[in-house]
């Protein structure tokens, strides 16, 4: 786990941290609450930089729902070193009473290459408590081959209150899809969960998921997980 320190600087909010995400102060327009480590990023897989390391960032709230944030993260052995894999990102967001929109952009160093990613996210909340969230990310890889220089990720999820808890389901790409020989693969993941409080201090969230095989000869993977959260 990482450690971070957040503090005000004028009208802005600033953070510094170790083993934290550079996107810690980003506002990603997604209200989906699934517990898996694949679809919970709402397709903001790379633009919302989450590689850990030494991180810094700042956010500013303009009021009326508009915010802007920026972040950077560096490997443990160096900061802004030409030989290190650093990442820089910016996030713009608008949040209203029943919907939100956000745009995230990142430049991620990969050795001597500089890859860029752009993520678009949005959600809408109905009066009955039902929420729909969606996201799409596209990337441009700094490689010599024009047939393998793009990435994609997408997501759509729905969630809302059912009984004492929250029911949700989503589908999307299982991580980032990378172009190969001019063809973008499509490996989808599906999941459904129900999160409910056992008592005032404990919440249990069972989830079932399926990940499609990466090829015709690769079998689909189906599994179940249970997340237990405690609060004191």
Please describe what each predicted stretch is.
Residues 64-65, 83, 87-189:
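Detector for outer-membrane/organellar transmembrane beta-barrel domains
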Residues 44-46, 80, 122, 146, ...:
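Outer-membrane beta-barrel proteins
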Residues 16-20, 70-74, 103-107, 134-138, ...:
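Transmembrane beta-barrel strands of outer-membrane/channel proteins
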Residues 187-203, 207-213, 229-232:
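Extracellular low-complexity, Gly/Ser/Thr-rich intrinsically disordered linkers
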């Amino acid at each position: 786990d990482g450690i971070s320190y957040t503090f005000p600087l004028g009208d802005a909010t600033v953070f510094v941290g170790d083993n934290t995400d550079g996107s810690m102060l980003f506002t990603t327009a997604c209200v989906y609450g699934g517990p898996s480590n694949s679809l919970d990023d709402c397709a903001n897989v790379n633009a919302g930089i989450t590689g850990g390391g030494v991180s810094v960032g700042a956010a500013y709230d303009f009021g009326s729902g508009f915010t802007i944030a920026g972040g950077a993260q560096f490997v443990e052995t160096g900061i802004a070193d030409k030989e290190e894999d650093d990442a820089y990102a910016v996030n713009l967001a608008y949040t209203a009473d029943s919907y939100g929109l956000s745009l995230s952009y990142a430049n991620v160093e990969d050795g001597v290459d500089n890859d860029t990613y752009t993520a678009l996210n949005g959600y809408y909340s109905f009066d009955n408590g039902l929420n729909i969230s969606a996201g799409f990310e596209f990337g441009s890889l700094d490689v010599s081959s024009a047939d393998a220089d793009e990435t994609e990720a997408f997501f759509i999820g729905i969630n809302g209150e059912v009984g004492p808890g929250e029911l949700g389901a989503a589908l999307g790409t299982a991580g980032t899809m990378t172009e190969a020989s001019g063809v973008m693969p499509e490996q989808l993941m599906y999941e459904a969960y129900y999160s409910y409080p056992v008592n005032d201090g404990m919440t249990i969230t069972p989830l079932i998921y399926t990940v499609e095989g990466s090829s015709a000869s690769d079998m689909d993977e189906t599994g179940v997980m249970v997340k237990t959260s405690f609060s004191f």
